[in-house]
Amino acid sequence: MRALLVPVGLDLYAVPMDAVREVVRAPLLTRLPTAPALVLGLFNLRGEIVPLLDTPALMGLSRIHGWSFVAVVRSPLGPAGLAATALPEPVALGEAVGASESPATAGTYAVGQRLAVLLDIEALLGGASLPSHDLLPSQSMQGAG
């Protein structure tokens, strides 16, 4: 299976390539004071408003510090950005070396000498823990450019 490795500090997360739209450098963010802590803010991606999510916080882990790239993924609620501390890169995953620890993951895979947790984007980003896009500004910005 092809996946995008999303590095977050010393941890690696893998996202199935069919869920990945693109990777971008850290964008200018608009913070949302009333948003859940896992929403770092919103950014404009060529006229489309995309929430940037704290990748480890989605998994119930400590918050990210110093992110510099964003993996933009397709989710049941629309596009979402996963924060990364280094440039995400595509890889071919072999057989899983560990079972899923959470309903939002699909196993653990060996990548070189490291382990990567494969994220189930639909389960992870389709959950009730995320704000509905109805609460966020319009997905397209008229006249933005």
Where are these regions (language model features)?
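An acidic, low-aromatic, low-complexity terminal/linker signal
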Residues: 1-145
